[in-house]
């Protein structure tokens, strides 16, 4: 991998990680459109450490409170009803599905799931799902001619059942094209949560899974002779810087705007990919990067 490739891919990772458009799909597509090797699942996982570092800094106050309260709840039973302590436990609960499925489906994630036809299908299907969830939330928030606006749930209403459903939505994002934020936020909207609440839990929930995946892949990469460490680490730093700017913008965006621009973008991109693969312009199976 060249330094220019790492710069571009780092920017792509940072720009798309927190948007409901699938960062793994865009890394895969950027390489395919540019004629580069597929950067692979390991590169994606390692550079995601950079974007999750942006989450840690952006939500540092929330995370600090959650960790402190959760730690105290281990020895003080009265703390187990504290909202921050509960959030810590619910992040753990929500991380179980992706932990189990990530280890079980590791070979598929690194191989068959990276087929561009699957990526395109997921972009379209999940795009439609996000659109339905967005319209449902907008209808509740605005009400209608014969119905009053509906009060949507806050994170204080989050329980084990909802946490597990969020976790299953996150696990679906193991398939390129789904989008971690798109799947979890739309899942939250379907369960009746406010947009900001759904997004906040989505980003907090991603921290253990992404960091664990990144460390796991980092361990394997350190034992490999086929990793371009300089460019990979450079891409991770670029992803961190870009990701921080995007997450700050996105949290403001979702409070007042619809997800429909992302929905139409996903559907259009999915259709373009299917057409280009069908006419032979793009190969559905790109070669893995050799370094």
Curated annotation (Swiss-Prot):
One of its GO terms (molecular function) is undecaprenyl-diphosphatase activity. Pfam families: BacA. Its EC number is 3.6.1.27. Keywords: Antibiotic resistance, Cell membrane, Cell shape, Cell wall biogenesis/degradation, Hydrolase, Membrane, Peptidoglycan synthesis, Transmembrane, Transmembrane helix. The chain crosses the membrane at residues 39-59, 85-105, 118-138, 198-218, 231-251, 262-282. It comes from the Bacteria. One of its GO terms (cellular component) is plasma membrane. It is a multi-pass membrane protein. HAMAP family: Undec_diphosphatase. NCBIfam families: PRK00281.2-1, undec_PP_bacA. This is Undecaprenyl-diphosphatase 2. It comes from Streptomyces coelicolor (strain ATCC BAA-471 / A3(2) / M145).
């Amino acid at each position: 991998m060249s330094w220019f490739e790492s710069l571009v891919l780092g920017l792509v990772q940072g720009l798309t990680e927190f948007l409901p458009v699938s960062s793994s799909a865009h890394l895969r597509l950027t390489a395919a459109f540019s004629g580069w090797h597929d950067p692979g699942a390991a590169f994606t996982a390692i550079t995601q450490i950079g974007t999750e570092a942006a989450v840690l800094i952006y939500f540092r106050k929330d995370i600090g409170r959650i960790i402190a309260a959760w730690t105290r709840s281990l020895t003080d039973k009265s703390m187990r009803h504290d909202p921050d302590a509960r959030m810590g436990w619910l992040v753990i609960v929500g991380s179980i599905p992706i932990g189990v499925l990530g280890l079980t489906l590791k070979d598929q994630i690194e191989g068959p799931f990276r087929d561009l036809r699957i990526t395109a299908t997921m972009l379209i299907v999940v795009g439609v799902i996000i659109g339905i969830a967005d319209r449902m939330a907008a209808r509740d928030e605005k009400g209608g001619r014969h119905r009053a606006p509906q009060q949507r749930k806050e994170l204080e209403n989050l329980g084990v059942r909802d946490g597990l459903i969020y976790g299953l939505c996150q696990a679906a994002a193991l398939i390129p094209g789904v989008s971690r934020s798109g799947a979890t936020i739309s899942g939250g909207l379907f369960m009746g949560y406010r947009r900001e609440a759904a997004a906040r839990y989505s980003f907090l929930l991603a921290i253990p899974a992404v960091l664990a995946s990144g460390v796991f892949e980092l361990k394997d990469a350190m034992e490999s002779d086929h990793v371009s460490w300089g460019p990979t680490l450079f891409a991770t730093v670029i992803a961190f810087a870009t990701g921080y700017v995007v997450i700050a913008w996105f949290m403001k965006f979702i409070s007042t705007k619809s997800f429909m621009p992302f929905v139409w973008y996903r559907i259009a991109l999915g259709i373009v990919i299917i057409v280009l693969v069908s006419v032979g312009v793009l190969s559905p199976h790109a070669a893995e990067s050799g370094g």
